[in-house]
């Protein structure tokens, strides 16, 4: 079209500005495009703009001239600067496909100039079309250039005269009319949109082909079946005929032998009867087979008719579509010179004919260039005919600019970015400076008529375009392109992951392109791309090293990509988190990404260098150094990093701002290298964790103990930590900042995904499984993050529900999953707890004074948040808010009123505390909780320290913790809930990570919800427990023996816990009057299987308890006192608690380990556990028998514990009143016990269920330092201690 003046301007600008003109010529470029095939390609690129703007076809039409002109101009361009070449190209409109071969030669040369010209023409086109002018002016005053372009036209043309022909001058700079541009935009919109439909068609036809392939043998089989039927019937008839021939005369009496009276006809009658029956059978078979065959025949005939109709319809549609496409093509060609444009349509310039050669080249270049529009290239490649594809190639190439802005400097930048990828090939001839500008030309060149010389021409043009882009988009391209070139193989993947960066979209686009144009196009240019990449890669490596040394300060484009980078970061972090869950990566990834970004800035060097070491061997040394740092921190970071990741998520705002395209890429690559991110998170953890050292030390242990599980839990913990880790100083702020959205989310999702938002981010897969069974848990999650406060406030009402639901599911899931997945799940379960434990611990330490009092209840609440890991962390931060909003209800009521606290505690405590992730967190958290309650009750700090050291046993800690809070609330129901919780706590990681567990939990949870909620929801559980103790004890006791049996059996069969919980729910349903207590008791029965499970775990727990023997021994007394009330209900639900006591005995053996160990075994193996289970059930049912259970706990811990439980039963009954107080106190004791359980946390790893039994023992001790020292105190002392604790 009249783009030649633009070329002249481009030439002038090129001559004057050198590379700068590359930017300016963009505005002028329309002329160049019109004049040169490159111009036409830019037109195609423009056409991409034009395709978007409707220019593609119009531009395409002139492109024939441009192709010819460009061919000649390109030939001259070799000799002359781009300006002359451009003008010549434009002036040479008629004829140079041959010169296009020259262009190939001079393309490296021209590529440099042409990029400028092409970009200039693009600029003018863009200005004319989409405001390329404005962007060009931003690049180089495109409009000014256009104005000056006319003046320059003469000067540029003079250049052209020197180099090419003055032909450009006559052409004059012509802007594409708005209608033309819009028409082309619409046309390309149509073409691109149709590509996806063609994809769908291909997919459908593929499916149809497969179906037919399956159907054909089926139909053949049908025919074979009928053939077989006919054959068998024929055999029957043939045999009958043979028979008739043989016996025809002998079937009846001989006529003359005897008189008819004397001839018995019995045989004949029998034969007649049989034959008549056979005839009936034959008639049935004949009708059946005949009707079926007729039906099949009619069906297939009808199908054939329908297929014929479909065929005729499709042919009509094909004709219509072909007509439309032909008209579109003819109209496009009609817009320009008919003769010339007919040729361009089949020429590279138009992109139609170029599809095969130039488009292939472009696709190759595009892959190299990482075209901006990865999808677009595919679309255009699919939809556009060869010429259209060439155009679209350019268009697609430019469309990415168009996406950024059709005529904007971004166009140049975008085109530059794609060029950058094309660059590699073009870059061979054009230098790396041309790389970015080459890309557009490369794209442009395919449309050029360089059909035969397309590879070289495209390449050359790509090169020429590249210089311009280099300047215009070089800032972005230089870094992103160099990056992409540098790590083009891996970085392309990274770019794909981080499409936000030019390199990302560039490289994505090339992949699309290759799809449109198969490897053919790729191979020719990719070799060059490799060479160019080597150059760029070196530069980029240097840049990367510098930026990395500066902690990746070269963040190219943080603009809207930051969010994406955060997401990518999440991916980066997420992979390590969800070792068990990869599906949940992305949600956590975002937060993790921001964490990664912040970590990248702080400790990103480690991950970045690690990734660079992968992607860039030049950076291997630095990466190794950082990797070593990462390796060091990985042990800590795996736990800490999870917290730091949360912290990273917490500092997400700051971190996310920093993410750059490079950072995104690095993170994308880091996503592959998860260990790197832990290093990053490590630094964040340091920021977030007030007690990183303590927790890190634990984390160090735990990472070793549970490296893989920790990763998965790290993912969870990360999310929990996102809210929980900052809880100390900025947790509240973060919760407030993130909590609004998350609170809203959690409030909205809390029922379904209360903690799921965090979990989704951190552990989407585990949580989703949990979702199945976590409807109740979600309300608890609401309590945990931001919604934790809000949802606790509004969720207090449904806390019981949520707790009731989760507790049983947790118990069941914990039992079944912990038993089955104890070995596997322990790691899974433990790792998240360590993370959260670390987080919780520091948070607990921070919160301990504040939440120490509320901790007793808060643990319940915080346990309530238990969407798993969030529980502990959320408890810490949620403790203030949840305690403020919910604690009054749960904590105060639980302390003052067993009923109120019990429902809440049971709800939150059972449900949330069951979060196994929280067990570790509760370990640390429980120490905080313990410290909190000890602060309330004194001497909890040592427990917290112990818990910190024992945080390895998060599960146990959490289980005990759960038992503690539930007992405070509704001991009867809580006991049942507590055990499920404890089981769940032990298996919450499993539950969280294994939806099956939670799925199982859900039924139980539902049952509990039905039955327990009645007690919990009414908040009458303790009253009911007190009131219904007599009758509930009966039914509970009746139920409890089965439960006890279950307890015994679950140890043998890990799955038993689930079935027993189910049956226990049934039992719970059975004792509907004692629903509050009996229901709780049946759940306890359900948990009882958990204790049986503990036998196997007991060994593990015994080992672990040995680690925490001192702590447990100290806590044992407290556990007795605290757990007596809580245990009665919680522990009824938690025969494993008695097992825990056995575990505790192992841990207590230091003081009274031997005796305790024996009681533990007795608990598991002997009727003692059953008795305890019965007592517990009774206590749970009566809610007054916690003490008996406590005694049992004590007895478990102590050899004489069994006899004591009966003695304690009266005390338990007498403690009914204390149960409310004890429930709150016990919750703290349970927390304390959890610290003790923390010691058993390693044991938990060994045996999750065991962890819960020790929990009972530990809880009492943890709550009361005195009981710790006197854990072997008489049952009466534990009782007194619970009372004292209750008082406190």
Curated annotation (Swiss-Prot):
Organism: Homo sapiens
Protein name from the UniProt record: Photoreceptor cilium actin regulator
Disease linked to the protein: Retinitis pigmentosa 54: A retinal dystrophy belonging to the group of pigmentary retinopathies. Retinitis pigmentosa is characterized by retinal pigment deposits visible on fundus examination and primary loss of rod photoreceptor cells followed by secondary loss of cone photoreceptors. Patients typically have night vision blindness and loss of midperipheral visual field. As their condition progresses, they lose their far peripheral visual field and eventually central vision as well. Cone-rod dystrophy 23: An autosomal recessive form of cone-rod dystrophy, an inherited retinal dystrophy characterized by retinal pigment deposits visible on fundus examination, predominantly in the macular region, and initial loss of cone photoreceptors followed by rod degeneration. This leads to decreased visual acuity and sensitivity in the central visual field, followed by loss of peripheral vision. Severe loss of vision occurs earlier than in retinitis pigmentosa, due to cone photoreceptors degenerating at a higher rate than rod photoreceptors.
Pro residues biased stretches: 1051-1063, 1071-1094
Record has Transcription as a keyword: no
Bias (Acidic residues): 483-495
Composition bias type Basic and acidic residues, residue spans: 1097-1106, 1268-1277
GO cellular component entries: cilium; cone photoreceptor outer segment; photoreceptor inner segment; photoreceptor outer segment
Record region (Disordered): 78-147, 368-401, 423-453, 467-527, 563-605, 686-707, 813-1109, 1132-1169, 1190-1288
Main function: Plays an essential role for normal photoreceptor cell maintenance and vision.
Gene: PCARE
Record lipid sites (N-myristoyl glycine): 2
Xref: InterPro entries: PCARE
UniProt feature, compositional bias: Polar residues: 96-109, 382-401, 434-453, 848-857, 894-904, 927-946, 966-976, 1209-1226, 1278-1288
Extent of Low complexity compositional bias: 1018-1028
Compartment(s): Cell projection, Cilium, Photoreceptor outer segment; Photoreceptor inner segment
Cited Pfam families: Retinal (PF15449)
Protein's GO biological process: photoreceptor cell outer segment organization; protein localization to photoreceptor outer segment; visual perception
Keyword terms: Cell projection, Ciliopathy, Cilium, Cone-rod dystrophy, Disease variant, Lipoprotein, Myristate, Palmitate, Retinitis pigmentosa, Sensory transduction, Vision
């Amino acid at each position: 079209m009249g783009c030649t003046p633009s070329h002249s301007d481009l030439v002038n600008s090129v001559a004057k500005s050198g590379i700068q003109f590359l930017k300016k010529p963009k505005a002028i470029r329309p002329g160049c495009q019109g004049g040169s095939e490159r111009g036409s390609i830019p037109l195609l690129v423009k056409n991409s703009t034009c395709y978007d703007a409707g220019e593609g076809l119009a531009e395409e039409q002139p492109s024939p001239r441009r192709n010819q002109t460009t061919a000649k101009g390109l030939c001259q361009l070799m000799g002359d600067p781009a300006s002359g070449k451009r003008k010549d190209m434009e002036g040479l409109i008629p004829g140079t496909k041959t010169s296009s071969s020259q262009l190939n030669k001079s393309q490296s040369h021209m590529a440099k100039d042409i990029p400028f010209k092409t970009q200039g023409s693009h600029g003018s086109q863009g200005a004319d079309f989409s405001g390329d002018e404005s962007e060009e002016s931003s690049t180089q005053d495109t409009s000014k250039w256009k104005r000056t372009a006319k003046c320059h036209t003469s000067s540029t043309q003079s250049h052209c005269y020197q180099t090419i022909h003055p032909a450009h001058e006559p052409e004059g700079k012509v802007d594409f009319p708005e209608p033309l541009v819009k028409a082309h935009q619409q046309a390309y919109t149509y073409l691109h949109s149709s590509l996806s439909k063609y994809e769908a068609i291909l997919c459908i036809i593929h499916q149809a082909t497969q179906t037919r392939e399956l159907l054909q043998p089926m139909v053949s089989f049908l025919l074979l079946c009928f053939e077989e039927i006919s054959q068998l019937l024929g055999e029957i008839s043939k045999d009958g005929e043979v028979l008739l021939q043989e016996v025809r005369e002998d079937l009846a009496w001989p006529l003359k032998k005897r008189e008819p009276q004397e001839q018995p006809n019995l045989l004949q009658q029998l034969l007649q009867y049989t034959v008549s029956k056979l005839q009936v059978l034959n008639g049935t078979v004949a009708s059946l087979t005949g009707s079926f065959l007729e039906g099949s025949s009619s069906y297939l005939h009808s199908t054939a008719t329908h297929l014929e109709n479909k065929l005729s319809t499709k042919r009509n549609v094909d004709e219509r579509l072909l007509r439309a496409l032909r008209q579109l093509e003819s109209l496009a060609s009609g817009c320009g010179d008919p003769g010339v444009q007919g040729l361009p349509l089949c020429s590279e310039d138009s992109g139609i004919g170029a599809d095969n050669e130039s488009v292939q080249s472009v696709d190759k270049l595009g892959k190299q260039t990482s075209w901006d529009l990865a999808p677009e290239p595919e679309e255009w490649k699919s939809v556009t005919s060869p010429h259209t594809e060439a155009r679209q190639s350019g268009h697609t190439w430019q469309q990415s600019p168009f996406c950024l802005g059709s005529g904007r400097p971004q166009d140049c930048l975008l085109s530059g970015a794609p060029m950058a990828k094309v660059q590699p090939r073009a870059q061979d001839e054009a230098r790396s400076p041309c790389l970015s500008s080459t890309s557009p030309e490369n794209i442009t060149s395919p449309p050029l008529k360089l059909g035969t010389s397309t590879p070289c021409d495209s390449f050359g043009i790509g090169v020429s375009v590249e210089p311009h882009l280099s300047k215009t988009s070089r800032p972005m391209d230089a870094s992103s392109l160099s990056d992409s070139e540098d790590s083009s193989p891996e970085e392309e993947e990274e770019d794909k992951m981080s499409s936000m960066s030019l390199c990302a979209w560039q490289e994505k686009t090339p992949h699309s392109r290759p799809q449109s144009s198969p490897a053919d196009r790729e191979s020719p240019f990719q070799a060059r791309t490799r060479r160019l990449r080597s150059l760029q890669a070196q530069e980029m490596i240097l840049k990367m090293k510098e930026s990395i040394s500066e902690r990746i300060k070269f963040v190219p484009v943080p603009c809207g990509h930051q969010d994406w980078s955060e997401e990518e970061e999440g991916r980066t972090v997420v992979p390590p988190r969800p070792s068990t869950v990869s599906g949940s990566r992305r949600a956590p990834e975002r937060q993790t990404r921001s964490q990664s970004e912040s970590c990248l800035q702080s400790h990103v060097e480690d991950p970045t260098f690690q990734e660079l070491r992968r992607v860039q061997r030049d950076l291997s040394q630095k990466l190794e150094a950082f990797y070593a740092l990462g390796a060091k921190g990985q042990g800590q970071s795996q736990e800490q990093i999870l917290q730091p990741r949360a912290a990273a998520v917490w500092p997400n705002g700051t971190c996310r701002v920093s993410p750059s395209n490079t950072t995104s890429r690095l993170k994308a690559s880091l996503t592959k290298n998860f260990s790197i991110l832990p290093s990053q998170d490590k630094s964040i953890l340091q920021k977030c964790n007030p007690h990183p050292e303590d927790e890190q030390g634990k984390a160090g242990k735990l990472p070793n103990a549970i490296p893989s599980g920790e990763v998965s839990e790290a993912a969870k913990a990360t999310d929990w930590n996102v809210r929980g880790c900052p809880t100390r100083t900025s947790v509240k702020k973060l919760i407030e900042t993130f909590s609004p959205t998350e609170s809203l989310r959690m409030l909205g999702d809390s029922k379904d995904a209360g903690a799921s938002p965090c979990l989704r981010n951190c552990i989407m897969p585990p949580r989703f499984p949990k979702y199945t069974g976590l409807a109740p848990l979600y309300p608890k999650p609401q309590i945990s993050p931001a919604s934790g406060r809000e949802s606790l406030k509004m969720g207090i009402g449904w806390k019981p529900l949520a707790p009731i639901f989760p507790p049983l599911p947790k118990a069941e899931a914990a039992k079944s999953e912990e038993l089955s997945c104890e070995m596997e799940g322990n790691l899974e379960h433990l790792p998240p707890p360590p993370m959260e434990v670390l987080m919780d611990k520091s948070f607990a330490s921070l919160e301990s004074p504040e939440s120490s009092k509320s901790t007793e209840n808060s643990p319940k609440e915080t346990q309530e948040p238990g969407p798993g890991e969030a529980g502990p962390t959320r408890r810490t931060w949620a403790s203030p808010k949840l305690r403020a909003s919910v604690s009054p209800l749960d904590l105060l009521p639980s302390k003052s009123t067993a009923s109120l606290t019990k429902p809440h505690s049971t709800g939150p405590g059972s449900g949330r505390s069951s979060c196994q992730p929280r067990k570790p967190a509760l370990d640390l958290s429980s120490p905080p909780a313990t410290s909190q309650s000890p602060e309330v009750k004194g001497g909890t700090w040592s427990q917290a320290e112990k818990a910190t050291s024992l945080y390895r046993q998060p599960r146990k800690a959490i289980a005990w913790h759960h038992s503690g809070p539930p007992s405070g609330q509704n001991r009867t129901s809580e006991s049942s809930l507590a055990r499920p919780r404890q089981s769940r706590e032990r298996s919450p990681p499993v539950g969280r990570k294994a939806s099956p567990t939670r799925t199982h939990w859900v039924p139980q949870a539902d049952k509990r919800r039905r039955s327990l909620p009645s007690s919990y929801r009414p908040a009458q559980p303790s009253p009911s427990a007190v009131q219904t103790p007599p009758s509930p004890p009966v039914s509970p006791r009746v139920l409890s023996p089965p439960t006890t049996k279950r307890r015994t059996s679950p140890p043998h069969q890990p799955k038993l816990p689930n079935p027993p919980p189910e049956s226990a729910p049934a039992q719970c349903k059975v004792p509907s009057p004692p629903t509050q207590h009996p229901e709780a008791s049946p759940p306890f029965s359900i948990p009882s299987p958990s204790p049986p499970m503990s036998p196997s775990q007991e060994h593990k727990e015994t080992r672990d308890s040995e680690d925490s023997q001192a702590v447990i021994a100290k806590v044992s007394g407290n556990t007795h006192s605290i757990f007596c009330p809580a245990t009665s209900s919680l522990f009824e639900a938690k025969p494993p608690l008695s097992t825990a006591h056995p575990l505790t005995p192992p841990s207590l053996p230091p003081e009274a380990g031997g005796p305790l160990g024996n009681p533990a075994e007795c608990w598991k193996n002997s009727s003692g556990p059953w008795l305890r289970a019965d007592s517990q059930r009774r206590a749970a049912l009566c809610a007054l028998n916690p003490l008996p259970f406590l005694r049992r706990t004590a007895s478990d811990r102590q050899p004489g514990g069994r006899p004591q439980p009966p003695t304690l039963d009266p005390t338990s009954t007498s403690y009914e009143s204390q149960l409310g107080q004890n429930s709150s106190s016990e919750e703290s004791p349970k927390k304390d016990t959890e610290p003790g359980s923390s010691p058993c946390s390693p044991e938990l790893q060994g045996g999750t269920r065991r962890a819960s039994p020790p929990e009972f023992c530990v809880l009492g001790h943890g709550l009361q330092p005195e009981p710790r020292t006197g854990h072997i105190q008489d049952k009466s002392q534990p009782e007194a201690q619970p009372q004292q604790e209750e008082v406190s």
